[in-house]
């Protein structure tokens, strides 16, 4: 505790650079800024941004209000860390939750729900169903769980997707969203990222997956890295 989001982002950047990240992330949508390390502690997680995502972060200044900011991590609040890495040209995207001290059971339950929604989306894609069907299934599950007004943002500032294809670029298609009436092709890679946002913060999970003949194969940490980690 006591460290700023930006200080923590610096540590994450060191690890990523040492693992081969070259410094740039390609985007298909132009012009679009992208902060590859989003760290949102507590109420920073509720701040919407110009970036089409559930959690944008406050950023270091008003000229670039995206990513980690000067908020300090406090005990008892969720800390969302979303990192984009590029390995030999190929993009991966991963989110995990952290906390210091006691984290309320309400937050833990919300994370469990997001994990379940991620499984629903993944299973739908793995069967070869359309990405729009995966979106609808995930969205309906969220509404049944009581997260309809907070899924991927606080209404009306909600991102309308639950996953995005990645490859040589961060924002490839298809997307798990309405209107993408086609499946993720065999060999296609998708970052699946259900998140729920409240005034006190954000919580969720993200991994990058590839569709195989047997279903969806995880390309990032998956079950090897816990969804919630206590410092």
Where do the model's predicted regions map?
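Active-site neighborhoods and metal-handling regions in enzymes and metal-associated proteins
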Residues: 1-231
């Amino acid at each position: 505790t006591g460290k700023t989001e930006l200080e923590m982002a610096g540590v994450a950047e060191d690890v990523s650079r040492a693992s081969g990240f070259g410094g740039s992330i390609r985007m298909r949508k132009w012009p679009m800024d992208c902060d590859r390390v989003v760290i949102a502690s507590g109420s920073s997680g509720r701040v919407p941004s110009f970036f089409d995502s559930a959690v944008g972060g406050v950023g270091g200044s008003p000229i670039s209000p995206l990513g980690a900011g000067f908020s300090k991590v406090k005990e008892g609040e969720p800390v969302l860390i979303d990192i984009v890495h590029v390995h030999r040209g190929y993009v991966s995207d991963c989110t995990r939750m952290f906390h210091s001290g006691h984290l309320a059971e309400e937050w833990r339950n919300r994370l469990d729900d997001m994990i379940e929604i991620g499984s629903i989306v993944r299973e739908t894609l793995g069967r070869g169903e359309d990405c729009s069907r995966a979106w609808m299934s995930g969205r309906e599950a969220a509404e049944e769980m009581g997260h309809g007004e907070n899924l991927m943002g606080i209404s009306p500032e909600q991102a309308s997707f639950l996953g995005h294809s990645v490859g040589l670029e961060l924002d490839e298609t298809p997307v798990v969203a309405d209107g993408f009436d086609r499946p993720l092709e065999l060999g296609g890679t998708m970052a699946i990222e259900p998140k729920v946002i409240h005034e006190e913060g954000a919580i969720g999970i993200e991994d990058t997956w590839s569709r195989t003949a047997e279903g969806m194969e995880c390309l990032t940490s998956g079950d090897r890295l816990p969804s919630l980690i206590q410092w």
